[in-house]
Structure formats: C-alpha cells, structure tokens
Amino acid sequence: MMTINICRDFTETPGARYKSEGEFSGEEFRDDLLKHKYLEARARNEKLIIELDGGYGYATSFLEEAFGGLARMYPQNEVLDTLSFVSNDEPSLIKEINEYIIHANDKKKRKH
C-alpha cells in the first residue's frame, strides 16, 4: 500500500485549479506527484491512499482538477479502484472527490 499525505508531501496550502493561477494548483499536484504515484500503484497492483488531513482546506477547483483530471487521463473504474481517501477532519471530502472522478469521466465522453 502506498500513501500520499497532501500536507506533508505537497503543501499545507493547496491552491486553485491550474498552474497558471499560482503555486500548488490541482494541476501541479496531479502532474508532479499524483500521476506518478498512481501509475506506480497500478503497476504494483496496490492501493494508493490519499491522506487529506492537516492542511488549510481545499478549493473545489483543486480537487476536481487533481482527481477528476486523473480520471480524464486514465479509466475511471481504475482510478476509483486504485485510490482510497482518508479524511478525519472533513469526511465529506471523500464523497465529493469520488463524485469528481465519476463526473469527470462523463465530461470526457461529452467532449467527443
């Protein structure tokens, strides 16, 4: 089992959606950390635990771009099967993120 603690491994102050909007964006997190750990977990047939606690909160745009964006890059069912979220501080984030993953896949289909 692999783990990313966003606060420890990325930042305590997550930013907006895109790199062009400033530091610590969802896009930066996905491209620089999440994607690589996700692919490593898939190759090892392991879960990737995402620990959300410890920071100063998340913009919805950060979460959608990071996790919804991953589901636009890779099959939605594989993303859902591989990622597991932990949030004792704000448990509702887990459902919110799973919804972004599910709906990101639908948006991808509509673009074609």
Where do the protein language model's features map onto the residues?
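Short amphipathic
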Residues: 1-8
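Amphipathic alpha-helical interaction surfaces in cytosolic regulatory modules
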Residues: 9-46, 50-98
